[in-house]
């Protein structure tokens, strides 16, 4: 008989929390009972879980003794306050905030890349889910690095507003609507107008000129893949609702060409490659909404630098960039560790 688990999704009314519930249902995760948890302001609301409707429960009233696995999807402050309570009750936590990602005692997992490090989870009973840009980057970069070591990476991200939560999506919608009726809608969630605009500012601005988002991406990539290369990152917010895209310039330590890169990626787990032989041979954000794969296209040689490749990565940031990755981690946990 298949063992079933009690699951809690904390932040169940947010973008990632709702998607986590959707994916748990889609993939028939063996659940005995599922708890949809959010702040007190969300009490009385309902969320979908497959064909079922779940009532929102309060985090403050949740008994972690009753929970086997908790998905934390509510940000670093909530994680900081409540994860110690969860782990003290022997609940395994999969945390989607940035709080534990660079903690050396907490594995930072992308299942296609570094599942072998998952065995370290029981040091703290916490597994960290990487940044929503780092996940597709790691899926694409690791199989290449396995073949020929990467020397450096230059990354420009084009991140949708859903990465900033429902408030970010609402702000894009409201500003767009206001522009069509000649109204004004001042930015609240974002530092500048997002409708019909882009800006290279995600997270806080650091003293070195990089943003906190850019620093996270570089440090998390090194933790997952290795410290033998450096990454220079520019993170850009774009007026797209769902779907992150990434322009990547990769310099290798040895000779490689675009054809070889394409062949390596075609054999890699979790990737769909688009050949340059096709007309419109690239994937845009609207095409990946609801998709689980990481799409890689525009694979080409950098004509300005030897041993260097350019490519374009696109994925659904709410699915593989967040919720799906964490559910895949949970599947591995119950198959081999719990």
Swiss-Prot record:
This is Aspartate-semialdehyde dehydrogenase. Its EC number is 1.2.1.11. It catalyses: L-aspartate 4-semialdehyde + phosphate + NADP(+) = 4-phospho-L-aspartate + NADPH + H(+). Belongs to the aspartate-semialdehyde dehydrogenase family. Substrate binds at residues 159, 237. Keywords: Amino-acid biosynthesis, Diaminopimelate biosynthesis, Lysine biosynthesis, Methionine biosynthesis, NADP, Oxidoreductase, Threonine biosynthesis. The gene is asd. The lineage of its organism: Bacteria, Pseudomonadati, Pseudomonadota, Alphaproteobacteria, Rickettsiales. One of its GO terms (biological process) is lysine biosynthetic process via diaminopimelate. Phosphate binds at residues 101, 216. It comes from the Bacteria. InterPro entries: Asp_semialdehyde_DH, Asp_semialdehyde_DH_beta, NAD(P)-bd_dom_sf, Semialdehyde_DH_NAD-bd, Semialdhyde_DH_dimer_dom. Catalyzes the NADPH-dependent formation of L-aspartate-semialdehyde (L-ASA) by the reductive dephosphorylation of L-aspartyl-4-phosphate. The active site is at residues 132, 244. It is an enzyme of class 1 (oxidoreductase).
